[in-house]
From Swiss-Prot:
<protein>
    <recommendedName>
        <fullName>Uncharacterized protein YclD</fullName>
    </recommendedName>
</protein>
<dbReference type="InterPro" id="IPR012349">
    <property type="entry name" value="Split_barrel_FMN-bd"/>
</dbReference>
Amino acid sequence: MIRVNCMSDRLFELLDGSCLNEKQHEAFVLQTVSEDGWPHAAMISAGEIIALSRTDIRIALWKNTMTSANILRTGKAQFTAWWKGAAYYVKLECAPLPPLKDAEYERDRFSCRIVSVKEDVAKYADLTSGVRIQLHSPEEVLSRWKKTLEDLKR
């Protein structure tokens, strides 16, 4: 298990916003803490998170979700990703970004700084998958994701 405060080349490759067609089946778990102190989990896709650098990422969430409310309240989140034989647990400090008036898809957007990354691999077994999804309308969703990721860069 490796702990650092920036993402590895492999994790950056997953979150760099490129090759969405190849990453369309990947889903991640974004964890926050609810007002009553319980963990709250939500799934996000490769089209809702982008790494601007190895220490800074941005996340786009549907408006007015429990996850958004939790991040706004605490300024913290953790996401878990699985990619190329490893699990990644990434702790984030998050701040809201202003709304974009010309965004086609209105989202709650967050700028996040990585606090820590734990890369987890097992010596005795191969991690072969994490959360996998099958899009119902891939062309439509991939188009939306591309626009969302472009908006996150602004």
